[in-house]
Amino acid sequence: MASRSVISFLYQQGGLSLAELPPAFLAPALYSTKASFNSQRSQFSTSSSPAARDRSRFRGVSAIHRTGPKQPLPVSKYPLPKPASPEQQEKRPANPDHGLWGFFGPNKQAIPTPEEEYAHGRAWTIQELRQKSWDDLHCLWWVTVRERNRIATSNYERKRLAAGYGDFEADNRDKTVRATQHAIKHVLRERWYAWNEARELYNGGYRPSPDEVLEEETETAMPTEVMPEELDSSTKSETTTSKNI
């Protein structure tokens, strides 16, 4: 195919005719593609050569390994601003009600004493949280989150300074806070299950009658009756326990 293309090209340009060309084995140069390509190709390039790739990771960082910019960059005629010294700056008064103080104790110290870490109450029970509203549970949850953040901050500072005290009290306090969080999750899970079951009943076509609704409201509103016998037994048990104490 290459020999045919060269021969046809010479014939079209008015060169040697097909009859005047010698055979290929006598003049192989006439039939080679390199001769035709080299005659048309220039020996130099007019396009600018691309810039060499700079493989230095320290260009512009180190004074020894830097190579400088590859192209001229604009420079502003205005000087760079200089930072003011701390002595010239006005001291702002500390805000005692700032939200970041919640990461510290009441005395606003990074590491509380073991007595302060141990001075806490018990965890909220599930029975107590069932009586709370959605807003109360929401507020209580974020109170526990802030308390755990405060405990984590004190643990970090205690470990950084190698204080050597307060780890046991902080762990007990964190366990109490986590118990409250588990109780909140349990109550919310119960309410979600109740809502899901009510939704399935409603979608299934169940509609409570007005009498059933009134009975449920009266049962929840009225307190449970206590028999006199139960009161007598409770008073007797209290007197016996007081005597034992």
Swiss-Prot record:
Q: Which UniProt keywords apply?
A: Mitochondrion, Ribonucleoprotein, Ribosomal protein, Transit peptide
Tell me where it resides. Answer: Mitochondrion
| InterPro entries membership | MRP-L47_sf (IPR038340), Ribosomal_uL29_mit (IPR010729)
Q: Does this UniProt record's set of keywords contain Ribonucleoprotein?
A: yes
Question: What Pfam families does its record include?
Answer: MRP-L47
Which residues lie within the region annotated Disordered?
Answer: 36-98, 207-245
Which residue windows does the record flag with biased composition (Low complexity)? Answer: 36-49, 234-245
One Gene Ontology term of the biological-process aspect is:
mitochondrial translation
User: Is rRNA-binding there in the keyword field?
Assistant: no
Q: Which GO terms describe its molecular function?
A: structural constituent of ribosome
Q: What cellular-component terms does GO give this entry?
A: mitochondrial large ribosomal subunit
- Similarity field: Belongs to the universal ribosomal protein uL29 family.
Subunit-structure text? Component of the mitochondrial large ribosomal subunit. Mature mitochondrial ribosomes consist of a small (37S) and a large (54S) subunit. The 37S subunit contains at least 33 different proteins and 1 molecule of RNA (15S). The 54S subunit contains at least 45 different proteins and 1 molecule of RNA (21S).
This protein's name:
Large ribosomal subunit protein uL29m
- Taxonomically, what lineage is the organism? Eukaryota, Fungi, Dikarya, Ascomycota, Pezizomycotina
The coding gene here is MRPL4
